[in-house]
Each structure stands twice: as C-alpha cells, then as structure tokens.
Design a protein with these regions (language model features):
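Glycoside hydrolase catalytic-domain context in secreted enzymes
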Residues: 1-403, 407-409
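Conserved small/polar residues in nucleotide/adenosyl-binding loops
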Residues: 435-440
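Aromatic-lined ligand-binding clefts that engage carbohydrates, nucleic acids, or primary amines
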Residues: 408-410, 414-429
Length: 444
C-alpha cells in the first residue's frame, strides 16, 4: 500500500514538473536497529529488541516497498542504521561503540544480513557512531569486509544526514568524532570505503579531494555507476509506457481499500495488556468519561516521526467521543510531554454551544466569504497541514481560512497566560481586544 501510494504521488508530481525534496522513490526504511535502550526516542521506529523478529519484519517491509516486477523496482527500501546503532541520541555524533564479536554477529548484524540476502534491499544507510574507532560511514570492516565482500552487497550505501560532517567539523556545543582534518579527507575516505551518497554537504569537497590526489575519477565512477544503476532500475530514464508502476493513478491514494487495510493493520498491531473490570469495550451507558494526557487530543503527536501525512487523523479523544456520543467526555491535558515543571492547561474550561472546545468554521477562501464549508467542534488547536493534511472534511489544503470561537470561564481568580503561534497571519480576539500577527512562526 505504501509503495503503491508513493508511486501514485511520484507519477503525479513528475507530470506536474515537481521534483522537490521528499517527492522521490527512495524510502529510508526499515529501521532494523534493536531497541535496547528505552531512552532512545526513536525506538518507536524499530521492531523491538528481538533480532529474529526484527529480521522477519524488516525483510517483509523491504519486499513490500520494492515490489515484485522482474525488471523495475517500485521504490527503494533502505536498511538503517548500519551498524550497532541503538541510541542514546545525545552522543551519537561522537560515540565509539564497544561490543563483543558475539554480540555483533548474533545481535546487531543478523537483520542487516537478512535484508541484503533475503530482501535484496537496494540501499543501506551507515550510522552516525564509530565502530572500533572508525566512523561507520568510513569503516572498512563494516562496509567493505562484511557488507560488500562477505554478504555480496553491490547496491547503494548512503550516509545518515550530516554523518560525514562528524568526521571533520569542530563544534563545542555538539562534540563530534573529529577523525579527519578537513572535508576533502573525510569525503574521500567515505567514498573509498563504500559510501556512495551523502545526505549533507561535505561531498562538495570531493572536487578539491580529486585535485589533491586523495581520490581518483575511477574511484568516483564506482559510486556513480551504483547510483545510476539504481535510478535506471526505478525506471527513471525509460518512457512511462514501459514502466508498469508509472501507470498507477493518483486516485489510489487513500482509496477505500487502502483505508480499510490501514485500519486492519492498526487493529492487528495493538496488544491489550490489561482490561481491569472489563473497561473495554466502552459501554454506551457510561454517563461521564475523563480523558487525560497530552497525546489524547494531539493529532500530530500520533503521527510519530519520519511519517507520512494523512488527510485526516482521528485523535484518541475524538475516537472516544465517536464511540460514546451520548456520554459526557471531558478532557484534561494532565502534564507536559517533557519539562521540569507542570503547566496546568485550562483548555478544558473553554466551551461553545456544541460542547467542550471551540466552535470551528472553515471557508475555502482567504476572506471568510460565503457559507462555511465545515462547522464543527475543535477540542484542541494543534494543527498542521504537513503538506497533505486537511484541517477538516471538505476544506482545501491551502488558501482557506478558519474561525474558532469559544467562551473561557476561569476556575478561579488568577493570572492566566494565553499563547498562540502559527506559521501564517492570524488574529486573536479576547473580548473586544484584538491581537494580530502577520509573521511566520510568530508567537503572542
């Protein structure tokens, strides 16, 4: 489903002449690192700490992304982050991994080997950290001895974003490896050890490295051939009529079949650990339910990270209200995501005729003209289009306006702080007072 929709979007964007970033056919997934440290904030991308489960899931994802056509790949999958990279995040740009050979071969490498040999993965991303003193993106042991020579991998290796900069840049705020004197030495070493493509800007120095004799044109041609081969096998240089995936129409994106499949996957991927007093499924006879927590009414938080952008997200709060429409459902933030103090959110004291929250009105123009195309109840005002996400049904992705109206009754007499930020112009009315902002990312 993901690869099909990716191809559909790519086809439409190519025909529109849109070649911008994030609109290609390379997916930097799956993440087959092992989630061994709960402090690692990106652990939700992985399949846990079991090497066998990670291998099986990873191979399935690769095959699904890359398709089964005998000549062309649907998209490119990418095994990351190679290797021995499982957090913590804060020192990844300087960390030198120490791991026993047994742990390396039995724990950290099996999933990568399986993706290469069983999944035929087309890209591998080398990690930020060092291994045995060398940055992973210039490690002859990891990239040449194991990946290319032992496993027979002949496809693209690319760096994690900014990883080559860690070789040579000096930064007091962010300690780095500092294993190389300059960008040209770092870039040449990375290419010579198999890193064909950089996410970053250090490879600009390859021209100088070539002139200084640190690398040859023949060395560069090795990587160039791999990169061009990858593009040819995606069908980028062939007429659309010869590439079966180029025929996928845009209307498959979020089609009823795909939405049903996504819902099925969500159902089957959940595990109910406890159901005290048979609380679930929720009974429609319950008179009052309190929903507490910062993620309950936050659609963007539910997307996680490095995610696609759905046209609509059902928050936990919305889902509960939809399940028990006749039950009084109150919401409380409860706590912050991360802070050394607690902010008491008074948003649950904002009401409108429709209930707790703001009455919302959306117009498909920039002047509030005509009738609203959507009217509803907004429990929270944390919105982002993300390029594809509608604020409400039937509302344009761009060039629309919205009005949110509510009445705030303070629970007690005290000083209240109201914060509002946005990346476009907005106006805030408090009673008869007007506060305006015309600047991007402004805060009042």
């Amino acid at each position: 489903v993901i690869a099909t929709e990716a191809r559909a979007k790519y086809n439409a964007q190519q025909r529109a002449g849109d070649h911008d970033i994030y609109k290609g056919l390379t997916f930097w997934a799956p993440n087959v690192n092992l989630f061994r440290d709960p402090r690692w904030g990106r652990g939700m991308e992985t399949y846990g700490e079991d090497p066998y489960l990670t291998e099986r899931m990873g191979v399935a994802v690769v095959k699904g992304l890359q398709g089964d056509d005998p000549k062309y790949f649907k998209t490119h999958a990418c095994a990351k982050h190679y290797a021995v990279h499982s957090g913590p995040e804060w020192n990844r740009h300087e960390f030198d991994v120490t791991v026993t050979p047994r742990d390396l071969w039995q724990t950290y490498l099996p999933a990568f080997e399986a993706l290469v040999k069983k999944g035929n993965v087309q890209e591998v991303m080398c990690a930020y950290n060092r291994y045995q003193g060398k940055p992973c993106c210039s490690s002859d042991k990891l990239l040449i001895d194991i990946l290319r020579n032992s496993w027979g991998y002949e496809n693209i290796i690319l760096s994690d974003c900014g990883a080559i900069n860690d070789f040579w840049q000096r930064d007091e705020r962010t300690p780095r490896h500092e294993t190389h004197p300059d960008a040209e030495s770092a870039s040449a070493d990375a290419v010579l050890n198999g890193t064909d493509l950089e996410c970053g800007n250090s490879y600009k120095a390859l021209i100088k490295a070539l002139k200084e004799g640190k690398i040859s044109e023949n060395d560069l041609d090795v990587s160039l051939r791999r990169l061009l081969k990858g593009r040819f096998e995606l069908g980028m240089f062939d007429p659309d009529e010869r590439v079966p995936y180029a025929q996928i129409p845009y209307n498959v994106v979020e089609s009823p079949e795909h939405v049903a499949q996504a819902l099925k996957m969500a159902h089957k991927s959940m595990v109910l650990l406890k159901n005290k007093n048979n609380t679930l499924p929720l009974s429609k006879t319950i008179r009052k339910i309190a929903v507490v927590g910062p993620n309950a009414a936050d659609s963007t938080m539910l997307w996680a990270n490095y995610n696609g952008f759905p046209t609509h997200t059902v928050t936990i709060l919305e889902g509960i209200r939809n399940k028990v429409p006749d039950t009084e459902v109150i919401y409380e933030l409860g706590c912050n995501h991360a802070a050394d103090f607690v902010i008491q959110d008074l948003g649950n004291h904002i009401t409108s005729p429709a209930g707790q929250g703001f009455a919302s009105e959306f117009y498909n123009n920039t002047e509030f003209k005509g009738e609203a195309v959507y009217k509803g109840l907004a429990s929270q005002l944390h919105y982002t289009t993300g390029g594809n996400t509608q604020f409400a049904p039937n509302v344009n992705l761009t060039n629309f306006t919205a009005r949110f109206t509510g009445e705030f009754e303070a629970p007690e007499t005290e000083q209240v702080e109201i914060k509002l930020s946005g990346n476009d112009a907005f106006r805030l009315f408090i009673g008869c007072l007007l506060y305006t902002s015309d600047a991007a990312d402004d805060l009042i």
